[in-house]
Amino acid sequence: MDLLSALTLETWVLLAVVLVLLYGFGTRTHGLFKKQGIPGPKPLPFFGTVLNYYMGLWKFDVECHKKYGKIWGLFDGQMPLFAITDTEMIKNVLVKECFSVFTNRRDFGPVGIMGKAVSVAKDEEWKRYRALLSPTFTSGRLKEMFPIIEQYGDILVKYLKQEAETGKPVTMKKVFGAYSMDVITSTSFGVNVDSLNNPKDPFVEKTKKLLRFDFFDPLFLSVVLFPFLTPIYEMLNICMFPKDSIEFFKKFVYRMKETRLDSVQKHRVDFLQLMMNAHNDSKDKESHTALSDMEITAQSIIFIFAGYEPTSSTLSFVLHSLATHPDTQKKLQEEIDRALPNKAPPTYDTVMEMEYLDMVLNETLRLYPIGNRLERVCKKDVEINGVFMPKGSVVMIPSYALHRDPQHWPEPEEFRPERFSKENKGSIDPYVYLPFGNGPRNCIGMRFALMNMKLALTKVLQNFSFQPCKETQIPLKLSRQGLLQPTKPIILKVVPRDEIITGS
């Protein structure tokens, strides 16, 4: 009390002015949506609506969609987000106005060399990367990579056979995480890693360290709430990604390039070699479009990011869905057996042409879109469908909420692969089903991811059936943090279909 009474009137006035200024700074953008009559949860000074994410992005988006309709306003700190579920607006953002207005994704802090990755890069730099990398994902290239991936399918089958013989239930994420790790390191870097049996391999350890992410990490939260900190962090050489992992991959790419200069190695088919071929093309060098060593490293690392978590999680979700829907599992196994009688080795064409397999995978991706949301930055003032969006604001498309919208999907919580049958698929609006995005900036590795997952499912379902056990969570509950994950690991009983196990 003595301290307070000692303060002069001028000091009190100064404190009041400072508090008013701080409040004004912390709420300076928060009137944007109110002016346009756009509803949304009430933002807090400085934090905006970020604290609501604690319930889980997916859950928050579903609740907002139910409460506010086709458009609502959010604030990540001071950053305004236009959340849209109107399909015409989504089409405008992802396709019609992609190159002119909504080309780029949002910045999320200091990312170092990862700013040169195709999924992070902006404008002309992104177009250049996309043009150089797109030939890597043609069906012809994927067919060439198919045998590389198939060998890891055989390792997967062998491991599951050993686990099934013990009679103990199996944690799906452990198994498919290892499969995804092996496939992505082999196809990205040309490294053969048996991560199930060699979890201490330096490549595995550095990759796993790189993949650790927490939405509530203090560094990440600080740049979400205060984007102006990003250039300061960059000046201080602070990066969102672990420096030792980035350095490891930079050195590795350099060593691999040196090793592959001989004529024998240069014919290997993987993403690293295909990027090196583009780098060494004389015409590309002269026109300054070839990928530099740093750019090759960034693309290789982003392939790991895009290929590991979505693949391993989606495969786990698929098998949980099949285990809890045995009739669907049996129907899929029958299709696989018809296409590949007597457990014949799968081929690229056979795997990609199986209709029911495609239906099951599509329905799983509808129920469990790993990324939850799509985002695009508005790079100039624009009006879309009568809504004014200022330069620098973000348009957010809540894909999870769209995928569970009863207006588009009857009984949306039910697992029904028949939604994606030939008869029904044509009636699905492409802007309400967005597991890989849409438009020019959709996921460049979509075809690779689908091939990879379909091959794994074909291999395991040729040889095993999956059943719930006492450790299986039914119904599945989703975690509140980060990418879409179950609250508990998916654990299932693995039962050999007969004594003939292919790939063993």
Swiss-Prot record:
Result for mutant: I232V: In strain: Wistar
Top-level EC class: oxidoreductase
PROSITE patterns: CYTOCHROME_P450
EC number: 1.14.14.1
Effect the entry attributes to changing F213I: In strain: Wistar
GO BP: any one term: response to xenobiotic stimulus
Compartments, as annotated in UniProt: Endoplasmic reticulum membrane; Microsome membrane
Keywords: Endoplasmic reticulum, Heme, Iron, Membrane, Metal-binding, Microsome, Monooxygenase, Oxidoreductase
Induction: By pregnenolone 16-alpha-carbonitrile (PNCN).
Cofactor(s) needed by this chain: heme
One GO cellular component term noted in the UniProt record for this chain: endoplasmic reticulum membrane
GO molecular function: demethylase activity; heme binding; iron ion binding; oxidoreductase activity, acting on paired donors, with incorporation or reduction of molecular oxygen, reduced flavin or flavoprotein as one donor, and incorporation of one atom of oxygen; testosterone 6-beta-hydroxylase activity
Catalytic reaction annotation: an organic molecule + reduced [NADPH--hemoprotein reductase] + O2 = an alcohol + oxidized [NADPH--hemoprotein reductase] + H2O + H(+)
Binding site for heme: C443
Outcome following mutation: T207A: In strain: Wistar
Topology in the lipid bilayer: Peripheral membrane protein
Xref: Pfam families: p450
Family: Belongs to the cytochrome P450 family.
Function of the molecule: Cytochromes P450 are a group of heme-thiolate monooxygenases. In liver microsomes, this enzyme is involved in an NADPH-dependent electron transport pathway. It oxidizes a variety of structurally unrelated compounds, including steroids, fatty acids, and xenobiotics.
Record protein name field: Cytochrome P450 3A1
Naturally occurring in which organism (per UniProt): Rattus norvegicus (Rat)
Gene: Cyp3a1
